[in-house]
A protein has these predicted regions:
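N-terminal "mature head" segments of proteins
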Residues: 1-70
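Repeated scaffold domains used in trafficking and secretory/extracellular systems
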Residues: 12-22, 50-62, 90-99, 133-143, ...
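Structural motif
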Residues: 34-36, 72-76, 111-117, 157-166, ...
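Recurrent small/Gly-Pro-centered beta-turn motifs in extracellular repeat architectures
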Residues: 68, 106-108, 152-153, 200, ...
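Solenoidal tandem-repeat scaffolds enriched in leucines and small polar residues
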Residues: 112-205
Length: 260
């Protein structure tokens, strides 16, 4: 693709930023002061003051979520306005946004280990699960926003057992609970076929809502370079041991693994 002039360039407002995500034809990015929505040509189209210590940005086609990791606040916007502001009583560990704009926040709870809560585009709490036994590390929403998957682990005797649980958002009912023995969960992505891609310290698992699991790819943590999730798909960059390549890229979508 050919580019003319600086049409693909975006100049950051303060020269640096903490996190960013693709949004519409440009970029949503944040520093400790604000969230910015910018288009190529260095044009900032929307700006929200946040004042976060550690901002994290997630996006879908129509909305942008920014939350303060380690803090207690989150903001949801569209391309031109703030849709919801959430102020919590507990510190946010991680979060994600679904295709519908509904979003998930995982928090460190007093009296419990962790909690996972789903919020609507209006900031209303739609679902919450908390546990004193399970430490939740990741989660994601289905494309239609009707179900949520959470990844966590528990200590059983001398072992750490990872769990992948699916819940119905409206009723709060647990659909399934799949144990991944001898695997420590790192990241979960809810795929668009209704299953979950689960990255663990020994590789990638595919877990269905019916409770079945498949060890689809063996990857050691020392070989994992990076992982990213977006639009109900996961991408893995793994150290390569073949030819002159430095890394292999794998894409996980619709319940299948593609690559390298």
């Amino acid at each position: 693709r050919q580019h003319e002039g600086d049409i693909t360039n975006i100049e950051f407002e303060n020269g640096i930023f903490s996190d960013g995500a693709l949004f519409e034809s440009g970029l949503a990015y944040a520093d400790s002061d604000a969230l910015y929505l910018s288009r190529p040509g260095s044009m900032t189209t929307f700006q929200v003051t946040i004042g976060y210590s550690n901002p994290v940005v997630e996006s879908c086609q129509t909305n942008v979520l920014v939350y303060d990791r380690g803090g207690k606040n989150a903001v949801l916007t569209d391309a031109s306005s703030v849709k919801a502001e959430v102020a919590l009583n507990s510190a946010i560990l991680t979060g994600s946004i679904g295709r519908t704009g509904d979003f998930l926040l995982i928090t460190d709870e007093q009296g419990y280990r962790t909690a996972a809560a789903v919020y609507s585009t209006k900031g209303e709490e739609l679902f919450k699960f908390s546990s004193s036994e399970l430490y939740i590390v990741s989660g994601g929403l289905s494309p239609d926003g009707r179900t949520v998957a959470v990844l966590g682990f528990e200590q059983r005797d001398a072992s750490l057992i990872s769990h992948v649980r699916f819940y119905d958002v409206s009723s709060g009912k647990q659909i399934s609970d799949t144990e991944l023995e001898n695997a420590l969960g790192i990241e979960l992505c809810y795929l668009d076929n209704g299953s979950a891609a689960v990255l663990c310290d020994d590789g990638l698992y595919l877990v269905t809502r019916r409770g079945s699991s498949e060890h689809a790819l063996t990857v050691g943590t020392s070989d994992l370079i990076s992982v990213a999730t977006r639009d109900n798909a996961m991408v893995l960059a793994i150290r390569s041991y073949s030819g002159g390549a430095r890394s292999d890229l794998y894409t996980v979508r619709s319940g299948s693994v593609y690559g390298p």
